[in-house]
């Protein structure tokens, strides 16, 4: 057993802000020119990671990244899209969220296997989950430490450590 491993263990090396500190992953090969125009910036962000800026991706990207760092489920984004009169199906929302996650523009956070949130803040950080109102909140402390990390099996490496601390109101 190792004594302690700093958590978070993996950090993003590219810190270029796009629409409220969303960063293009280092493997993207180019940095988009930011204008402050959400529509333009989403277009550049998608192209920088090799995704075609379709109407659906552009509209969902604008809804996702235009409001700053946040945590959304597919259902929450679908509801926002419906209110904004964006013609997309729930399946398209799921597909787009998964594509953006695979491209490194979103981070997927699972809460007890029943609820999955998509985080626009892809930097290494952890979360509080507020059980009473089903809300995910970033933990700002960069010095969290995981004590007694088990040995990693031969042939494997740690890709990422996710910590979700569940909270409920005192009774």
Predicted regions and their residues:
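Basic amphipathic alpha-helical segments that dock to polyanions
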Residues: 93-103
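Short alpha-helical segments that sit at the start of domains
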Residues: 27-59
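DNA-recognition alpha helix
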Residues: 73-85
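Short amphipathic alpha-helical elements of helix-turn-helix/winged-helix folds
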Residues: 45, 62-67, 80
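Non-DNA-binding regulatory cores of transcription-related proteins
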Residues: 103-171
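C-terminal regulatory/oligomerization modules of transcriptional regulators
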Residues: 1-39, 142-171
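Short helix-capping/hinge SLiMs at alpha-helix to coil transitions
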Residues: 51, 66-70, 84
């Amino acid at each position: 057993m190792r004594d302690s491993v700093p958590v978070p263990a993996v950090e993003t090396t590219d810190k270029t802000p796009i629409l409220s500190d969303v960063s293009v992953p280092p493997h993207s090969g180019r940095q988009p020119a930011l204008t402050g125009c959400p529509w333009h910036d989403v277009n550049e962000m998608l192209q920088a990671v090799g995704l075609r800026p379709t109407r659906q991706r552009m509209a969902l990207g604008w809804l996702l990244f235009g409001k700053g760092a946040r945590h959304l489920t597919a259902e929450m984004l679908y509801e926002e899209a419906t209110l904004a009169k964006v013609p997309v199906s729930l399946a398209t929302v799921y597909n787009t969220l998964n594509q953006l996650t695979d491209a490194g523009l979103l981070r997927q956070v699972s809460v007890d296997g029943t609820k999955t949130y998509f985080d626009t803040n892809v930097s290494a950080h952890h979360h509080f989950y507020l059980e009473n109102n089903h809300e995910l909140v970033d933990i700002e402390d960069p010095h969290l430490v995981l004590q007694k990390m088990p040995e990693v099996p031969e042939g494997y490496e740690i890709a990422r450590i996710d910590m979700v601390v569940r909270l409920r109101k005192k009774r």
